[in-house]
């Protein structure tokens, strides 16, 4: 089973792809989709959509895992992140890819065993769990791999 994990954002959207074969979970790839600040929001969302669809077509995931929105102090940021999430939900839905949402607490708990772990702890565990040479960069990609890991350990495949 191939899983794409997403750390939603509109400036930087992280993705991570894992393969689960019985009880073995392995790293396929990871990266980010970035947009420029001076580009209108509707064009940024269109760009995110197009790049994400390319990932879906290239890697053919069986499931998509995405981090749910958590509390944002800045309402405008929350709205824009929600819009970027909507683009991911739409692209997945159009291709009949099942989508699973996880809270930041669930992701941290599944990866580290502690739901209040900090970002560095999560990144170190992602490196260790996936047997990578280095912590995935940028942070958004590491977070996306953590989201994918969360689904990989919870789903029966």
UniProtKB/Swiss-Prot annotation:
Active-site residue numbers: 7, 67, 140
Pfam family, one: RuvC
Alphabetized Gene3D superfamilies for the sequence: Ribonuclease H-like superfamily/Ribonuclease H
Comment on bound cofactor: Binds 2 Mg(2+) ion per subunit.
Cofactor: Mg(2+)
One MF term in the entry's GO annotations: crossover junction DNA endonuclease activity
CDD domains per the UniProt record, alphabetical: RuvC
Keyword Transferase: no
Cellular compartments annotated: Cytoplasm
InterPro entries membership: RNaseH-like_sf (IPR012337), RNaseH_sf (IPR036397), X-over_junc_endoDNase_Mg_BS (IPR020563), X-over_junc_endoDNase_RuvC (IPR002176)
Keyword Nuclease in annotation: yes
Keywords on record: Cytoplasm, DNA damage, DNA recombination, DNA repair, DNA-binding, Endonuclease, Hydrolase, Magnesium, Metal-binding, Nuclease
Uppermost EC category: hydrolase
Domain of life according to the entry: Bacteria
Catalyzed reactions per annotation: Endonucleolytic cleavage at a junction such as a reciprocal single-stranded crossover between two homologous DNA duplexes (Holliday junction)
Cellular-component GO terms for this entry: cytoplasm; Holliday junction resolvase complex
Residues at which Mg(2+) 2 binds: 67
Binding site for Mg(2+) 1: 7, 140
Alphabetical GO biological process terms: DNA recombination; DNA repair
Family: Belongs to the RuvC family.
UniProt-listed HAMAP family: RuvC (MF_00034)
PANTHER family: CROSSOVER JUNCTION ENDODEOXYRIBONUCLEASE RUVC
Subunit note: Homodimer which binds Holliday junction (HJ) DNA. The HJ becomes 2-fold symmetrical on binding to RuvC with unstacked arms; it has a different conformation from HJ DNA in complex with RuvA. In the full resolvosome a probable DNA-RuvA(4)-RuvB(12)-RuvC(2) complex forms which resolves the HJ.
General function of this protein: The RuvA-RuvB-RuvC complex processes Holliday junction (HJ) DNA during genetic recombination and DNA repair. Endonuclease that resolves HJ intermediates. Cleaves cruciform DNA by making single-stranded nicks across the HJ at symmetrical positions within the homologous arms, yielding a 5'-phosphate and a 3'-hydroxyl group; requires a central core of homology in the junction. The consensus cleavage sequence is 5'-(A/T)TT(C/G)-3'. Cleavage occurs on the 3'-side of the TT dinucleotide at the point of strand exchange.
Protein known as: Crossover junction endodeoxyribonuclease RuvC
């Amino acid at each position: 089973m191939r899983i794409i994990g997403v750390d939603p954002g509109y400036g930087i959207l992280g993705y991570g792809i894992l393969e689960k074969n019985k009880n073995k979970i392995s790293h396929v790839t990871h990266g980010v989709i970035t947009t420029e600040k001076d580009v209108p929001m509707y064009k940024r969302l269109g760009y995110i959509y197009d790049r994400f669809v390319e990932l879906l077509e290239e890697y053919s995931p069986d499931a998509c895992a995405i981090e749910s929105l958590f509390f944002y102090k800045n309402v405008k940021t929350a709205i824009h992140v929600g819009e970027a999430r909507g683009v991911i939900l739409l692209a997945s839905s159009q291709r009949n890819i099942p989508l699973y949402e996880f809270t930041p607490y669930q992701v941290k708990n599944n990866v580290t065993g502690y739901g209040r772990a900090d970002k560095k702890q999560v990144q170190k565990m992602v490196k260790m769990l996936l047997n990578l040479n280095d912590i995935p960069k940028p942070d958004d990609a590491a977070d996306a791999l953590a989201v994918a890991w969360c689904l990989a350990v919870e789903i029966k495949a």
